[in-house]
Regions:
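Residue-level structural signal for beta-strand termini and adjacent loop
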Residues: 27-28, 136, 336
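Conserved, mostly hydrophobic/aromatic
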Residues: 75, 79, 125, 152, ...
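Radical SAM enzyme [4Fe-4S]-AdoMet core and its adjacent flexible, acidic
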Residues: 188-200, 207, 211-317, 323, ...
Length: 444
């Protein structure tokens, strides 16, 4: 067990880096615990093998249950940080209705072989902008509504009344994007090909979605908007957004690196925004979970209950989900679309199982923190996972390199432990997050 300073006045965290077991310890008790004079260490040792097995299963024993499905290469926006190459977005192709239905049939047949009965795999129509190919997407949702849980990730510019009615009536999850609470900031990085911002269109879509329980908003944290994150969560809360994400920018392609923030200020503003969500909850009784941070909390308090798989190694790419390009090419994750080295095969030509076992996929599914320096010496490595492999490869030159950020993730974990020490963690998690979980360790 290794101690880390979490910045709390009363507690340190003791962590086993290999199993992600942890405990909060008062500094004056630390020496006794480490010397074995405390019941905590003796009790932990009795169960450490079980914790190791759980971590092994979480990291290496899962199979895909979701697909990020690009029904078109094209987008009506030209956002600064997009990970899809500009040429694809400006002049790419749509997947035909017939081809899209065939792809869903093949995916259904694959998941019937692998997903336990009673569980539905997930298809997220992603992009680029999937609603540019709306008719084909809607045909797929109609045809295979009993076989998949569907979602759509959209820039919201095409979410008119008819589209919202179709999606909400079929309980399709809807994710939209907005980077700030004012047009002046939001339009800096998210704009159309003419350079015009889309802030007002997104607000109109948010009003159409108000009251629906299955929508969320992604805010990408950049150097352009990080100082406005507190205002952002106030804006989301006032508009009754059920869940948001404040994802630190992925720096896979050069354009994104032009708006990359430094770790320390990004962490400072991010944590200030999280503090504000707690204040809003205390004032209103209504939570605003910031899902990417909620996932960090879950990684600590209930590792196997986490919903997102970017903050563990290997990440979820190629082992919990994979991405499908418009021409049927398969990639471990959407971040790799446009990087030919990571094309594993084609859905229309190859068996999914065979693609998952290709070298292109193994580059991602076998990337682990134990092989990355300095991550292999980091106490919190299983609460972070050294994301993202796409940016590690493209930005820093190899899969054995770190991604674009380090301190940012460290500060998130320290903050999460402080919340746990103060008994506040439930305010940052979804209602019912612990349904179906069991206690595997209770501190003596």
């Amino acid at each position: 067990l290794q101690p880390i300073d979490i910045g709390h006045p009363k507690y340190l965290a003791l962590i086993d880096p290999d199993t992600a077991f942890w405990s909060l310890v008062k500094p004056n008790k630390l020496a006794g615990v480490l010397a074995g004079d405390d019941e905590l260490l003796r009790t932990y040792r009795k169960k450490s093998a079980r914790f190791a097995e759980e971590m092994q299963m979480l990291r290496f024993g899962l199979k895909p249950s979701a697909v990020y499905f690009n029904p078109t290469d094209r987008c009506n926006l030209n956002c600064t940080y997009c990970y899809i190459p500009e040429k694809m977005r400006s002049s790419g192709r749509h997947m035909s209705r017939k081809r899209l239905l065939e792809a869903l049939r093949r995916l259904r047949d694959y998941f019937r072989r692998t997903v336990p009965k009673g569980s539905l795999p997930q298809i997220v129509f992603h992009g680029a902008e999937p609603l540019l190919n709306r008719d084909a997407v809607f045909a797929g949702i109609e045809e295979y509504g009993e076989d998949f849980r569907f979602g759509v990730q959209t820039n919201a510019t095409l979410l008119d009344d008819e589209t919202v009615e179709f999606l909400t009536s079929r309980h399709v999850s809807i994710g939209i994007s907005l980077d700030a609470a004012t047009a002046a900031v939001a339009n800096r990085t998210r704009k159309n090909w003419a350079g015009e911002g889309i802030f007002s269109q997104v607000l109109e879509a948010m009003e159409r979605l108000r009251g629906y329980d299955a929508w969320s908003v992604i805010c990408t944290v950049t150097s352009e908007n990080m100082r406005h994150l507190t205002r952002m969560v106030e804006f989301f809360h006032a508009r009754e957004v059920p869940t948001c994400l404040m994802n630190i920018i992925r720096c896979t392609l050069p354009g994104a690196r032009t708006v990359k923030p430094s770790d320390a200020p990004a962490a400072k503003h991010f944590i200030a925004a999280l503090d504000r969500t707690y204040e809003l909850y205390r004032q209103s009784g209504r939570k605003l979970p910031v899902a990417n941070f909620s996932n960090i909390l879950l990684a600590i308090v209930a590792p196997t209950a986490r919903r997102l798989m970017c903050d563990i190694s290997p990440c979820g790419g190629g082992r919990c989900f994979f991405a499908l390009a418009t021409n049927g090419d398969m990639f471990p994750c959407s971040e790799f679309i446009g990087l030919k080295k990571f094309r594993g095969g084609n859905l229309f030509k190859h068996q999914v199982e065979d693609v998952l076992d290709t070298e292109a996929f193994r580059l991602v599914t076998q990337r682990k923190v134990e092989d990355i320096s300095p991550c292999n010496r980091c106490t919190i490595r299983h609460f972070c996972g050294s994301p993202c492999p796409a940016e590690a490869y493209e930005m820093n030159g190899g899969m054995d390199r770190t991604g674009a950020f380090c301190e940012f993730y460290e500060e998130q974990v320290r903050y999460a432990f402080r919340l746990i020490a103060d008994g506040k963690e439930d305010a940052f998690l979804w209602d019912g997050w612990d349904k179906g979980t069991i206690d595997t360790f209770v501190a003596p």
